[in-house]
Swiss-Prot record:
Top-rank taxon, per record: Bacteria
Source species of the chain: Mycobacterium tuberculosis (strain ATCC 25618 / H37Rv)
Keyword hit for Protein transport: no
InterPro entries (UniProt xref): ATPase_NBD (IPR043129), Gcp-like_dom (IPR000905), T6A_TsaB (IPR022496)
Coiled-coil zones: none
Protein name, as recorded: Uncharacterized protein Rv3421c
């Protein structure tokens, strides 16, 4: 499918505690339908219902979709796996392209000026990146909040409880939005293989092998 044919996009993100699904018009970023459920332990369970509800809000069906955009993190292993596997499955089943984007870019790309973006990385750490007028200049990375260098940032966006750890004004957006995800795509490029941004080893530990 050529770039000019892509009009209606399914955007999903499971890199944060929010399970986000939305239907977006590519050319003007108008959100036709959106559902968000905040539940860090139910990404897999909530994503499909949210996708179907967003389609219903937009009065569309799966057959009306031209592309899928998915946030590839950084984020926890289990959450990312749910969103990226679903995006790949939708693309394969519908025969449409799937584009992966940095979830932090879906937040930072909607900011102006010098902005720090942070999201929850668990283990008392944050995923972060710095932006200047919506363009990422540093990151993504994962650190304890105290070890994050805000640099020239004049504001902080992202997870409110973690943004509050910095001596900076908090601004929106607080999570990746469907419009932000679609805006983060370079539509001039061909879709590339989806690569998750874990930035560290999964929390789950392998079981010991009995001998």
């Amino acid at each position: 499918m050529s770039r000019v044919q892509i009009s209606t996009v399914l955007a999903i993100d499971t890199a944060t505690p929010a399970v986000t699904a939305g239907i977006v018009r590519r050319h003007d970023l108008v959100v036709l339908g959106e559902r968000v459920t905040v539940d860090a332990r139910a990404h897999a369970e909530r994503l499909t219902p949210n996708v179907l509800a967003a389609l219903a809000d937009a009065a569309l069906t799966m057959a009306d979709l031209d592309a899928v955009v998915v946030g590839c993190g950084p984020g926890p292993f289990t959450g990312l796996r749910a969103g990226m596997a679903s995006a790949a499955a939708y693309g394969h089943a519908l025969g449409i392209p799937v584009y992966g984007v940095c979830s932090l870019d879906a937040i930072g790309g909607q900011t102006i000026g010098d902005t720090l973006v942070v999201t929850d990385a668990r283990r008392r750490e944050v995923y972060w990146a710095r932006y200047c007028d919506g363009i990422r200049t540093v990151g993504p990375a994962v650190n304890a909040a105290a070890d994050v260098d805000p640099g020239p940032a004049l504001a902080v966006a992202g997870a409110p409880e973690h943004a509050a750890l910095f001596a900076l004004p908090c601004v929106e957006p607080s999570r990746p939005s469907p419009a932000g995800l679609v805006a983060a795509v370079n539509w001039a490029d061909k879709p590339a293989p989806l690569v998750p941004l874990y930035l560290r080893r999964p929390d789950a530990k392998p079981l010991a092998v009995c001998t």
